[in-house]
């Protein structure tokens, strides 16, 4: 079992980050993968939507993957099925700027989380970033 971030203080610290890349961000209002990043965007976070099937979300162009994101990223928030987390973590590990990986509700991959932790970064699994922001920050 990995030592994912669970304390309120650790989660609050991650939520103090400025730039969040959202892998699997949706352009469809009403979907959690759109509404959660929209909530974060409205609260001043620099949200970088990542989705190979969208051209523009929140008024910005959408890169296909983390590999092609030129901006610095603090946190990678994952809205993809658990079986895709490992590939996303591979992209995270190619970057020096990401301090944490956050998987949304229902998304968990212990092996991928262990790799993130071994690289010296933090992991939050199976938690909604919007819910935690409302609970701890808003």
Question: What are these language model-derived features?
Answer:
Residues 1-15, 138:
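Haloarchaeal acidic low-complexity proteome signature biased toward cell-envelope/secretome components but also
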Residues 45, 96-99, 119-121:
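A short helix->loop->beta-strand "cap" motif at the edges of active sites that frequently abuts
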Residues 66-106:
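Mid-chain, well-packed structural core segment of small domains
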Residues 105-137:
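Rossmann-fold NAD(P)-binding glycine/threonine-rich loop
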Residues 21, 26-30, 37-58:
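NAD(P)-binding Rossmann-fold cofactor-contacting core
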Residues 16-17, 73:
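Phosphate-coordination loops involved in phosphoryl transfer and adenosine-cofactor binding
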Residues 60-65:
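Conserved SAM-binding strand-loop segment of SAM-dependent methyltransferases
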């Amino acid at each position: 079992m990995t030592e994912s971030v669970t304390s309120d203080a650790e989660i609050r610290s991650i939520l103090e980050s400025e730039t969040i890349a959202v892998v699997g961000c949706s352009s469809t209002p009403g979907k959690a993968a759109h509404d959660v990043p929209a909530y974060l965007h409205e609260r001043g976070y620099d949200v970088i939507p990542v989705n190979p099937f969208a051209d523009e979300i929140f008024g910005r162009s959408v890169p296909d993957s983390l590999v092609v994101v030129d901006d610095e990223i603090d946190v990678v928030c994952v809205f993809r099925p658990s079986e895709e987390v490992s590939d996303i973590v591979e992209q995270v590990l190619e970057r020096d700027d990401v301090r944490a990986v956050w998987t949304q509700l229902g998304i968990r991959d212990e092996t991928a989380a262990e790799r993130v932790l071994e690289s010296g970064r933090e992991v939050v699994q199976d938690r909604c970033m919007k819910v935690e922001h409302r609970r701890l920050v808003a």
